[in-house]
Amino acid sequence: MGYFEDTGNFDARTEGMSYAMMMCVQMDMKNEFDRVWKWARTYMYMEDGYNKGYFAWSCKTTGEKNDLGPAPDGEEFFAMALFFASHRWGDGEGIFNYSQEARNILSACIHNGEKEPGDPIMEPENYLIRFIPSRKFSDPSYHCAHFYELFSMWANEEDRPF
C-alpha cells in the first residue's frame, strides 16, 4: 500500500490520494495506482455510520482517521480515476473491480440518506455537489463538469439521469 502525504499538514487527504490515482492511471502506472487505491480503500473508506460509502477526508499516515467527514471532490476524483482504470486495465476482483467500486461511490453520493441516516453529496434539488454532505451549499472548485457526461454513461443505470 502507499499514500501521498500532504507535506504541510503531515497527513493523507482524499484530494491528494484521488489526484494521485488520476495521475497514475494517465501515466499507465497500475502498480502505484493499486497501492494508493488500496490504502485509501483500507484506511479512508467508511463502511458504516452517517457517512457510510464516503471517505474520511484526512487520515494520519498511520491510517487513523483525523475526521469522519468527506470532502466531496475526493469522491468525484476517486470515482473517475476508478472508471479510467477500468477502461485502461480492466476490472479485477474485490476492491480492484474498479468500475463497480466507482459505481458504488457514485451511488452513495446520490442516495445516502434515503433509507438510513446520512446525507447525499449531490444535492437532489439542484444537482450541484455539496461542500459537505450535511450542508446545502456548494463550492465551485468541487464542480467537475468534465466528469459528469462520463458519469452519466458509466454509473448505475438508475443513477445516470442524475
Model-assigned labels for residue ranges:
Residues 24-28, 44, 82-89, 106-113, ...:
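Sec/Tat-exported extracytoplasmic proteins
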